[in-house]
């Protein structure tokens, strides 16, 4: 009988679908990167998805985030994504946590018995905290570095944090991890594209010079085709890692 995962089953078989159905994956940050990662998980048949994000959809999200439409501005991102996934796979258990991952909330995050974590969050100090906790708990993690201020989606690659370069966020993360005694062992996706410089005349219009948060003062540029690709790559990587023990036959070169 045909079902929404029939095309997936052609490659990974019933045992592959069952493996994904029995997996729990967390997506931390459901924005331009995380919303596409979550959708990739849902359309692959992952059976339990934890969505973590405190934000509501903002008008500036509409250019790139999967759940962001003019009609959804002001609504919680996790709730919108949960409803979207329910229309893809009603059997998928979606846990929507409208909160930020912090030192006060992280224990609640890890209470769900996670098989994998996708980190698409923005705050570097909490990214570091998450990395340390995942290493301590032996939970596989892939963390997104910078997807803003980029225009070439073909420049993404997955590597150990120790092998990253060019990406300013990756540089900060490397430095902070070294101070914690961690030099390698954290899997990330980063771009080797040099970031663009935002237009100052536009920044004056959309930024807030009185804001305490740098991102509000200096909002980064973004588009539909870079963060989405990062999210899809992360989602695909997690799915295939969960399926690492499933035999997938390939055409042999002659």
Curated annotation (Swiss-Prot):
SUPFAM superfamilies: Activating enzymes of the ubiquitin-like proteins (SSF69572)
Swiss-Prot/TrEMBL keywords: ATP-binding, Ligase, Nucleotide-binding
The protein's enzyme class: ligase
EC number: 6.1.-.-
One GO biological process term: cyclic threonylcarbamoyladenosine biosynthetic process
Gene3D superfamilies according to UniProt: NAD(P)-binding Rossmann-like Domain
Pfam families: ThiF
Molecular function, one GO term: tRNA threonylcarbamoyladenosine dehydratase
InterPro entries: ThiF/MoeB/HesA, ThiF_NAD_FAD-bd, Ubiquitin-activating_enz
Family of the protein in this entry: Belongs to the HesA/MoeB/ThiF family.
Protein's job: Catalyzes the ATP-dependent dehydration of threonylcarbamoyladenosine at position 37 (t(6)A37) to form cyclic t(6)A37 (ct(6)A37) in tRNAs that read codons beginning with adenine.
UniProt xrefs under PANTHER family: TRNA THREONYLCARBAMOYLADENOSINE DEHYDRATASE (PTHR43267:SF1)
Stated name of the protein: tRNA threonylcarbamoyladenosine dehydratase
Source organism of the structure: Bacillus subtilis (strain 168)
